[in-house]
Amino acid sequence: MGTIKQIKAREILDSRGNPTVEADVILDSGVMGRAAVPSGASTGTREAVELRDGDAGRYLGKGVRKAVENVNTVIADALCGMDASGQRALDDRMRELDGTDNKGKLGANALLAVSLAAARATAAERGQSLFRYLNPEGPWSLPVPMMNILNGGEHADNSVDIQEFMVMPTGFDRFSEALRCGTEIFHALKKVLQDRGLNTGVGDEGGFAPDLPSNEAALEVILEAIDRAGYKAGENVWLALDAASSEFYQDGVYRLASEGREFSAEAFADYLADLCARYPILSIEDGMDESDWVGWKALTDKLGDRVQLVGDDLFVTNTRILKRGIDEGVGNSILIKFNQIGTLSETLDAIAMAHEAGFTSVVSHRSGETEDTTIADLAVATTATQIKTGSLSRSDRVAKYNQLLRIEEELGEQADYPGLAAFPQLRRG
């Protein structure tokens, strides 16, 4: 038993230069666990509350001193003396202290920092890697990476509507080889863009953000990059999209500003289905607005047997909302962002519910990240089989890939890489 002796938090900066919460959980043995909390750019309205100070004279109102103070006083007073390995008891106690449905009193950023730091402290106390602590007996699986190599929407200052254009290297036996593939495609894409006289600056998540005339133009330059790198789109590399449709949905209409087009839900489902018919797209995230359940159902009925349809803003890592999706046949996958729900226990519950229902799960970063690599261990421990942690630049993104390389090395022959088997519910022919 590792008894919690001290909990302390501080304000640090994330990858976008905004404050976030970092917490240390120190055990009576002197062992410490440390965790930092990410922050999103495009956020679902039902996400747990990220407590900000609102003081316009400091960090443009985005300071987190209130959340830090809540950790150092209310949470520390309640949790010191508890067993750090009792993850659910710790998380339940913090939820009781908060007393709201959305963690708006103490802040999900306060709760999550402590929740993750406690897990790290216990793993360190036991001399285990975090993924082994979370799942001591296995099985473990290295995830297929969704590599966001071209950014649009809220993640970039350009004219592309779709937020993320990703590559998924599936035709490989090891994660390290899949990572090499994605890296080579990333560098090839830079050359493709340079040859066309396009900008090669990067967005929040490390992907390129060129000013392209349409969403299809983005797909075309990626296909050219895959070919130049020596890989085969639709064979050993597939494409994935994060439409982030809530960002361009208003009054029942989906508006693609870059193309000057407007769609009803049914018509936008047809638009996405047409893209999937003409391009090797295996996964679409947030293809409909978070509140458009009718549209989501139409999209699922149209594509759900052959394309992974991931709910991010739709499900917000919340088991209550996920259960509705499962019951109504909406989507077939959930994006997992632990700051959407605010504790490790609730995150694990969402993954378990998804897998029990035959849904896939994709463990994800946020656009505002830190050097914290917890999501890499979480993906391996839960056999999520997929991870989304940005492009192949910016150390806040690459840190997660590097942690997965270390885990692969530690697992040795047990380091399973699923490839296309990560998508068991999809019909391919």
Curated annotation (Swiss-Prot):
Please provide, alphabetically and separated by semicolons, the GO molecular function terms listed in this UniProt record. magnesium ion binding; phosphopyruvate hydratase activity
Cofactor(s) named in the record:
Mg(2+)
| Pathway where this protein functions | Carbohydrate degradation; glycolysis; pyruvate from D-glyceraldehyde 3-phosphate: step 4/5
Residue numbers binding Mg(2+) = 242, 285, 312
Claim: Secreted is one of the keywords in the record: yes
Taxonomically, the superkingdom here is Bacteria
Q: Where in the cell is it found?
A: Cytoplasm; Secreted; Cell surface
Q: Which GO terms describe its cellular component?
A: cell surface; extracellular region; phosphopyruvate hydratase complex
Name of the protein in question: Enolase
Lineage per the UniProt record: Bacteria, Pseudomonadati, Pseudomonadota, Gammaproteobacteria, Chromatiales
